[in-house]
Amino acid sequence: MVVAAATGDPLRKSRTLRTENMDELSKNDVVKLLQENQGRMAIPGGLLMARGKKDYVGGMPALSGTLFFKDAHTPAVRDAICACFKEYQAVAGQYLTWLWREEPKDGKVCLAYCDAPPMPDMMKKLGEGDAVSFGYTSGKQSVDAGEWEFQAFGIRGWKAKMGTWGLSSVRFSMPLLYVEEHPLAFQTMFVKFADLLKAVHGYGGHALVLSLVRRTDNEPVEALMAEQMNGLDVGEPIQNAKGAGAGIKTVSWLTAINNELLEKVGGITALRSELPRDWFAAYPYSDGVVIQAGPYAEFATVNSDPLPARYILPNMFLKDVRTPHIGSLHSASKYGEARIRGAAADKWLARFDVPPEELLSFKAKLLDEPKLTKETTLPERL
């Protein structure tokens, strides 16, 4: 695989160990592997582009959570976004280095994190007709991708009132090593954010965190990796905002769904029936539930297990509330490089679909997949 070679063999190795030989590895082995190879996971900027600057970090593997919600133009929801960042800041603040803003009311578009005003102060200066736009990263250079990242995007009030512009979003990421060392941190934060934002839906799992301001030049790497890993998130929330208004984008290790959407597929009773609690946990939040699929996130690599039952079963359960069409996950190609657009994007949405007659075989397959453990499950489950 080209990307693995470019980012160092340890990325390929860690993926293979996690998906194929997890039973043979102790937790300490996984942590040691990530510790020894942290610096080799960075993907050079513009790696698959014919032209463009290459002297920066274009992407970093991480766990990423995305939540879609309504009414980001209102004071209450803007306060909720600030509360989310406060939670994130308590964990990631020491690693953050840069803040990017779109159309700031005052100051520069890019600020060193140490010089940035508190988010509530910046938020208060925004009017209802202003877009919410904050992007915090841990990259060494301002254009570098970082394993720690927090993005908040809120559509303008007039767009929100039209009801045709989709949903706003918050996206956060954590390094793979941090999640291994703190096995409940990602789930805790994801559920907390869903609760604060009254999320309509969302997902959390493996992702490639791309440069905040040079995303377009690094999408081809994401496209190539997505061909090899079904468990990898693709596309940015801002680009997917309209599609998010029509239904969920995908399932992942964590999947948030509000009560309105859940009722359309049979409610909590159907969830408990279709997703056995030995493998799936349901955590309540203010407006719905978060479903955890197994003890850890799956890459679902094509050369090991592209169709894990822990992802197939929730996908089929929630398929009827999935957005039917997303348009494009990537921007247009510049020089003929690979992108996930149009029919390819719709195919990606359906990557975990299986014929209904095969569901029974995946329920049988689930019996051989890792179960939840006390160490990997939050206590506040239904």
Task: Please name every model-derived segment.
Residues V2-A6:
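Compositionally biased low-complexity segments, especially N-terminal hydrophobic helices
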Residues G93-E227:
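Internal, hydrophobic cores of structured domains that mediate oligomerization or house catalytic pockets
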